[in-house]
Amino acid sequence: MPCLKLLFLFVFSLFCLTAANAADKPNVIFILADDLGYGDLSHAGGKARTPHCDRLARQGMRFTDAHTTSSVCTPTRYGIVTGRYNWRSTLKKGVLWGLSEPLVAADRLTTPKFLQQNGYRTGVVGKWHLGLGWQMLPNGEKRLAKTGPTKGDGWQIDYGKKVTGGPLAIGFDESFIIPAAHPPSYDTARSRS
């Protein structure tokens, strides 16, 4: 019986230490909403009621002085994920489309990799817009070469094969994304490490 009490005390202590360590690290939730202005949320004077966002703003940290060199989808996401100016990427203007190749190199230190190195689990949900490594059907490359990634229709993709070069390749533990918000592919991609 004393061994059982000692074991219980050890397990309980271990649990308390683990819980204390987890509490030392704050949760990080980063919300990037396209076409959402600073004053659109109700906590900032907006007319729309946004109680959950308001609560996050009250209980967390808000950054209210941000600047960008390109306020469209891909460059903004590239800057947030890599911490680099968007013009340092291979995309010098515009946005990536649903069939575009990955923009962020897998060997680059990214925000999610940095967070992982500091004990966080990371995930991304929503519009990806940073390119994916789709596997093509036979003759799919020829068809895509004709239409280009901006007009690709998704028929050339082999949906039975693994998608590479996405969120997991640059440090996210989990993802549930759509490749882009405009013409195909509208398919969702869910993955876990």
Language-model-derived ranges and their functions:
Residues K5, A20-S193:
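Formylglycine-dependent sulfatase
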Residues K5-C16:
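Bacterial N-terminal signal peptides
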Residues M1-P2:
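N-terminal hydrophobic targeting signals that begin at the initiator methionine
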